Amino acid sequence: ENTSVKFVCTDGARKKAPGRRLAWIPIVAVAAFAGRPPRAADVDRFLVVAETPDSPGLAIPTVASSFGSFAEVADAVNAERERVAALEARLASLEKRGAEPLPAPAAKDKAAAANAKDAKDDKGAKKDDKKPADPYEIGSDKKLGSTWKDGFQGESANKDFRVKVGGRTQVDAVAFSAGPNLNQPPNQGGLDPELADTVNFRRARLRVEGRMYEFYDWACEYDFVNQINVNNEVYPTERDSGPLTAVTDLWLQVREVPWLGIVRVGNQKDPYGYEHLTSSRWLNFMERSFAQDAFEGPFNNGFLPGIQILNSNEEGNVGWQIGEFKNATNPFGFSNSSGGSMTVGRLVYLPVFEDEGRKLLHLAVAGRTMEPRRQYTRFDSTTGLPIGDPITAVRFRSRGDIRNGPPGPLNSIYADTGLLQGTWQNMMGLELVGNNGPWSFQSEYFGSWLYNARTTSAGPYLTNGYQPPPGTKVGTVFYQAGYAEVLYFLTGESRTYSKLEYRFDRPVPHNNFYAFRDGGRRIRVSEGAWQVGLRYNYLCLNDSGVNGGVLNGCTLGLNWLLNPNARVYFNYDCTYRDFSSTPWKKDGTPGTSYDGSGWVHGFGTRLAFDF
């Protein structure tokens, strides 16, 4: 029944203020004594007062109304506690023997109910794991479902088949300022073509890639704005150059080959250089370093026909790549030279790799050993046909950090050795890369040795520096290059990392950029991702009397990532060119020496998107 009662404190406070009600406590306050055995003083401290007109009681239903005293309440609570303790002991005994836990009681506590459901789901999942898998024939499910995964993609339910169609477009706008020596005619040490403000497409590619029968991957990609010089051995002219479709990736690979890993055959990037292996879709700056242009991919767009093996240890912190390639000097994926075989290898170690690469330290060494490609050095001025016998020769040259034209031979050349004959070439590369949240660091060093080198009658080019007289033996020629760069995401993103080729992967903004008016005509904006970067760049093509020039450059970059597939670059670059040219006369005597040294300042912006 409902009991109207009052509890009034009668301790010392009541004695100090007789007749004053100090506290009103409902009967449920008896729970305060449930945690310990009752004491006589507890009852003495409370006085049950009958309801009076000037002091009404609180009429509330209570669970304690059936108890006659606090002692009875305490006894009931203690009995309940003993029962709970017995249940807990029983539960522990059952769990120790591996039995199923007791079902959770229906409780008002949602968290307890959720935990019980999770335990039940886990138990069901373990039972499902023990069931034998339904028999499935690889390749039997050819139905593809479409989705968007950084591009349009169709994939089967069992992932045996996949087709992805995409591409990339990069449009540049650049402006330059250069010292007077660099604006001289090219046969007097100046740049050729002369630097000029330019708008052009840097890349425009279409790509189709996919998977078939689970273990076979393939890729086909073509570049539609690549410039090609049909006479690569001579100084390029507009007559010999034009925009022609060139192949980049065109390969088939087999995955999970025992003891080998992945075996890839076709036109592809050879595993030499971190920057080289990183896709142009998410380069840190508008252009790769001087080292890339001079050593890693001159004249072939960075892609070579060959075979490559990619593998790693079980933990994935050690990876290796090795391959045999043809040293082609054209972007069409073929070589008709009897020389130019090239063996390339790369070994990577990740002493630190945490949080899927958001914190990592990457150390690697790469090497190339090759016979220079056999090529002709003289051509008929009327027919353009080669004259004489081909020789094994190499040309080292580099363009600027900001380009003044589409890719190909018509860009201004900053450093150039001319054509050098040699019997063998070895190259070495060192990589040091770090990532820590929004911060990233990237650096590489390259060295190249050309053995039994001698100058050729094909030199000098109009763009090359000083060479000794044609036919002069200069022994082993050593050239080197390197760069170091630091980048920081202002909006807190972190670089992603791929363990397939051990390089940075696509960065993803926390929030995509947008700007629109809502229903209240207020402008809503999301910033996308913003990244700043600084790079120092170095190239030395001076050695053994062959002086192709020395370049020191500094690039400041600001990258705005609108979404994972679109970004805008802003680059400012200043490069100092240390260069001199000595054209040779027809009688084999040196002509006048010209100084082509000076500063080049360039500003470039690029809108790049891929799909």
Language model features with spans:
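N-terminal periplasmic/intermembrane-space "pro-region" immediately following the signal or transit peptide
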Residues: 38-170, 176-184, 235, 494-518
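N-terminal export/targeting leaders of redox proteins
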Residues: 36-39, 542
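Outer membrane beta-barrel
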Residues: 147-373, 379, 478-524, 529-544, ...
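Serine/threonine-rich, low-complexity intrinsically disordered segments
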Residues: 5, 12, 27-29, 62
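Outer-membrane beta-barrel pore domains
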Residues: 139, 193, 238-240, 253-254, ...
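Sec-dependent signal peptide recognition
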Residues: 20-27
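N-terminal secretory signal peptides that target proteins for export/translocation
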Residues: 1-19
